[in-house]
């Protein structure tokens, strides 16, 4: 059903970024403002990690913590050229809802693939 698709065909291009020193309170405001469930932690040049809604729930009672203190480092990433089937397998095996799409040329996140995006594709293909 999805064998002809690559990650780049379904991913959302671009990501919302915060810096290492961003306070959790500001991360929460950013996530609410853009209605998203995760952000990338970057210094503009280097990708350091991600903060998901689960990370926020774990640390909600300490709003002064920084992104660096609560981020998930070394999250699983995938190439935009990867087969979508492989990305789905990774997400199912690891129990994750987001896969960040990393440029094959540089240490930069170029998009995100979420379980919502995949479910939407499944729905479109069923119709």
UniProtKB/Swiss-Prot annotation:
Residues in CBS domain copies: 11-68, 71-127
Return the InterPro entries for the record: CBS_dom (IPR000644), CBS_dom_sf (IPR046342), Diverse_CBS-Domain (IPR051257)
SMART domains xrefs: CBS (SM00116)
UniProt-listed Pfam families: CBS
Q: Which domain of life is it from?
A: Archaea
Which keywords belong to this entry? CBS domain, Repeat
Mind telling me what this protein is named?
Answer: Uncharacterized protein MJ0868
Q: Give the organism the record lists.
A: Methanocaldococcus jannaschii (strain ATCC 43067 / DSM 2661 / JAL-1 / JCM 10045 / NBRC 100440)
The major lineage groups are:
Archaea, Methanobacteriati, Methanobacteriota, Methanomada group, Methanococci
């Amino acid at each position: 059903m999805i064998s002809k698709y690559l990650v780049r065909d379904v991913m959302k291009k671009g990501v919302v970024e915060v810096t290492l020193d961003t306070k959790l309170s500001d991360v929460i405001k950013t996530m609410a403002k853009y209605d998203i469930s995760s952000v990338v932690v970057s210094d503009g040049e280097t990708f350091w990690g991600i903060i998901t809604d689960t990370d926020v729930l774990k640390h909600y009672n300490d709003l002064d913590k920084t992104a660096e203190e609560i981020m998930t480092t070394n999250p699983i990433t995938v190439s935009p050229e990867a087969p979508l089937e492989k990305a789905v397998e990774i997400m199912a095996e690891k129990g994750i809802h987001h896969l960040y799409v990393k440029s094959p040329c540089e240490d930069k996140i170029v998009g995100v693939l979420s379980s919502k995006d995949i479910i939407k594709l499944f729905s479109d293909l069923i119709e």
